Regions:
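His/Glu-rich zincin catalytic helix
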Residues: 1-63
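Arginine residue identity/basic-tract feature
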Residues: 22, 37, 64, 70, ...
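M16/MPP (pitrilysin/insulinase) zinc-metallopeptidase core fold and M16-derived inactive scaffolds
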Residues: 41, 45-97
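Active-site-adjacent, His/Asp/Glu-enriched structural segments that form or flank metal-binding
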Residues: 76-148
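Histidine-acidic residue clusters that define the catalytic metal-binding segment
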Residues: 144-158
């Protein structure tokens, strides 16, 4: 079998950033998959499931309520390696074009202090696995990366 695209990225050189992972064409529509990399793979500790789960709930809620992007959001969810998240948007976009959206989303996560949306037994299959304070921490850490993002944090390393 061929190696999938995400396994061809040099994870030794990869830094936290916002990257275009792939672009898929479905009929006339393009779907852009973004790699929201919060930790340096194989170097920094990965995120625990509780904060990953909390970030997932907060980001999905924010993105699906953001007036300019809500109709373009296909999916937001965690990477299995727990070093980041994937954001899928309907449309052909660059990292630079979605940088304001992703930055605003993670500022929301950084500053959020209320009950986590969907964190109830009726709404979620694992509602107790949440950690808002660590989600706030990771939100702040990633905002720092995004606010200072240059091309090395917006394009995969060669």
């Amino acid at each position: 079998m061929e190696k999938i695209t995400s396994f061809t990225i040099d994870h030794i050189k990869l830094q936290p950033g916002l990257y275009v992972s792939r672009k898929d064409h479905i009929g006339a529509e393009t779907v852009t998959t973004f790699d929201l990399r919060l930790t340096k793979p194989n170097d920094e500790p990965v995120m625990n499931t509780a904060e990953v789960h909390t970030i997932e709930h907060l980001a999905a809620t924010y993105l699906r309520n953001e007036p300019n992007w809500r109709e373009k959001v296909v999916y937001f969810g965690p990477m299995g390696c727990r070093t980041g998240f994937y954001l899928l948007l309907a449309g052909d976009y660059s990292s630079r074009e979605v940088l304001p959206l992703v930055t605003a989303c993670f500022r929301f996560i950084r500053d959020y202090r209320d009950a986590v949306p969907g964190a109830s037994p009726k709404d979620c299959g694992n509602y107790l696995d949440m950690n808002l304070s660590m989600a706030n921490y990771w939100g702040a850490k990633y905002v720092g990366v995004l606010e200072n993002a240059d091309e090395t944090r917006l394009n995969y390393p060669e």
